[in-house]
């Protein structure tokens, strides 16, 4: 175990605890930048999904891990971002303005959900957000004139300033850039008075209120920021899949997102990335591992779901 002694406030709020962190983060970034030349196309696609889910995980970690508000309908924000991006793209907007619209609308919906949720806590908040998830899924399925209903919407490759990002490598770097930007934003937020207020609310609402922290304001702000990051992830998810439909943003997706941050480690920015890595790669390794099992076991229906659930 390494002990780090801090002698001034600037060391306490630094992004890196010591020089070793700078080295390892730099090495990780180097590997991520070189990944398109090191990985096959299939695994590069999986890594792209890890980056996309990491952005969503950062938002949910901000809400659940740092503010203590659990959402069981978070896939709804993902869906709002994805469908907004799809509709704006079909209307002729380029990637950046469409992304701004997707992020903004998701954030606005987060505020709408956050305000009623101020009156409930714990399992009741979970039920409220779960109900919201069902409502959004139903709206996406019924509003056929805009969302295409159950037939879904097809998307094309993102258009950046007149240039189509159609290659897997180009889209990967776009996701990597937005992931780094989101991570730095969350890290700096957590070092600010706002981030400290989130943590204070998570630890004790009574103590936080006694220190002058406005619970309603900061809870709503946490919902808004979490939903905004989910909107960014949803926009990227829509372009990566190139087809979206309401069932992609149902209760199972919400449970996966919540498990992602719980398994990764609540209250840790790293946990969002570890959880996303687990969520994306575990089913792939289960599928690959079936080849080494006896035929009777390997071809048994539901094996993947069973192992995934047990883990």
State where each predicted segment sits.
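Transmembrane alpha-helices and adjacent helix-loop boundaries
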Residues: 1-311
